[in-house]
C-alpha cells in the first residue's frame, strides 16, 4: 500500500509567519514598556539633539507606541501581514536614522527605549535594529532569491 502525502510545506509562508511573530513580540514589548514609563520616555526624547524634539516629544510619546500597537494588528492579520512587515521595516529605518543622529552628535545621551532594550548602547541598538530590519524583509528577499519554479514533474502540483 502506497500512501502519498499531499501536504505541501511552504517555507515562504513559515518565514512570513516567523518574521511577523518576532516583530509582534518586539512591538508589543516596546509599546507597553514606553507607555508604562511614559514620563521617562518623553523626558529622554526631549534631551535629543534633534530640532523641535523638545516640543514634539510629548506627541511622539503617544504616536510611537500607538503606531507599534497598530503594527501588531497588521501583523496579526493574514490579509495585511505583508503591509505590516513593510511598515515595520520603515519604522525600524526611522529609528535607525534617529540612533545614527544620536551617535553622530557625540553626546552621551540616554536611550529612549523602554525595558531591557534600554540597556543597549547606541551601537548595539544599530545592530539590533539592523537585525530586525532584516527579519522584516526576509520573506520578501526569500521570494526574490528563490522564486517558485513549477515543472511538470513537480510533486507539488
Give the positions of each predicted feature.
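Membrane-interfacial helix-loop segments of redox and metal-homeostasis proteins
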Residues: 1-157
Amino acid at each position: 500500500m502506497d500512501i502519498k502525502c499531499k501536504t505541501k510545506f511552504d517555507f515562504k509562508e513559515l518565514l512570513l509567519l516567523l518574521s511577523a511573530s518576532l516583530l509582534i513580540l518586539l512591538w508589543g514589548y516596546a509599546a507597553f514598556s514606553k507607555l508604562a514609563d511614559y514620563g521617562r520616555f518623553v523626558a529622554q526624547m526631549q534631551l535629543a539633539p534633534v530640532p523641535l524634539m523638545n516640543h514634539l516629544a510629548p506627541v511622539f510619546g503617544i504616536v510611537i507606541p500607538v503606531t507599534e500597537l497598530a503594527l501588531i494588528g497588521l501583523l496579526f492579520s493574514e490579509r495585511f501581514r505583508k503591509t505590516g512587515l513593510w511598515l515595520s521595516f520603515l519604522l525600524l529605518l526611522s529609528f535607525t536614522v534617529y540612533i545614527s543622529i544620536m551617535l553622530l552628535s557625540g553626546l552621551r545621551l540616554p536611550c529612549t527605549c523602554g525595558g531591557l532594550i534600554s540597556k543597549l548602547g547606541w551601537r548595539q541598538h544599530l545592530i539590533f535594529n539592523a537585525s530586525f530590519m532584516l527579519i522584516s524583509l526576509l520573506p520578501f528577499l526569500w521570494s526574490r532569491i528563490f522564486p517558485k519554479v513549477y515543472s511538470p514533474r513537480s510533486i507539488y502540483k
